[in-house]
Amino acid sequence: YTTPATLRAGHRYSFSVGDMPAQAQHIASGRSDWMKYLPDNAFLSQISIPGSHDACAIYGSHYEYKSGMPHERYHFKWLLSWLGNTNTTKVTKAQELSIEEQLAAGVRMFDLRPCASSASVKDLPIHHGISVLGDPARGGYTPGASGRQELSPFLLSQVLDRFVRFLEEHPGETLLVHMKYENTSTNANKRGWNKSVVSCIKSRCNGRIADFTPRMTLADARGKILFVIREDYKSDNGGEYLGAYLNWTNDKVVFETTLHGNTGEAAPIKVNDLYNIKNGASDGVSKYAAIDECIAYTYN
């Protein structure tokens, strides 16, 4: 097509732009398979990958109060007694789309927060802070019903099953799954968390676990999940990581750290973790500056 453009007063120009490159056309029209059109030799570190913060925080808590509407989800009963009958969705809800809808929209990195309630657990519920997140897809919720209902919670095993099903149907894609130890003021249950996460990943994602190296390509990861886990759990997995270990420092504006795999090599990474934003222009400025710093880092 041809379009006019004014570059300076009194001078007019025109220029022609050809068709969109074939890869870009495919990516724009098919978000469920956008990665398969990228070249195999593209480094994973070169790709801008859409991600989902607290990916399971879709409906809030697994407790429902009275109205039966998805936007009326509430925290635990004891938290309700503390807050009163106040809609606490703003505290827990972070997403509008289900896991399946996020995958179909092109999201490829998912932030999961499993919680260990004891030192010996078989499966892990997904949390947002202190709140167990409800999963209506698993039943236990009757729209329009009166009184409190208990939704089935999101469980790590079943979220991983959904990821594996997606990769079976879309083998050209890859997923990144970030995990951290959630909802605890002590490390009393850390060993149980480590063992449960390792067991769950191995049993649910057998043959789908991507090995991390700093120069891994898309070909190395197609049809697989690259786990990026903040906890150093390798002593509970025979001295090896399942994917990458992310050495993390909490609540810093911007910090540099490393990703580690099993090859002994480390990849540098810059993180913006300024999440505790208060009202006020100065906090917003700090957040935007931190984002800009990280974006600039990716181009250097």
What are these regions (language model features)?
Residues 184-233, 238-247:
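Catalytic domains of cell-wall/extracellular-matrix polysaccharide-remodeling enzymes
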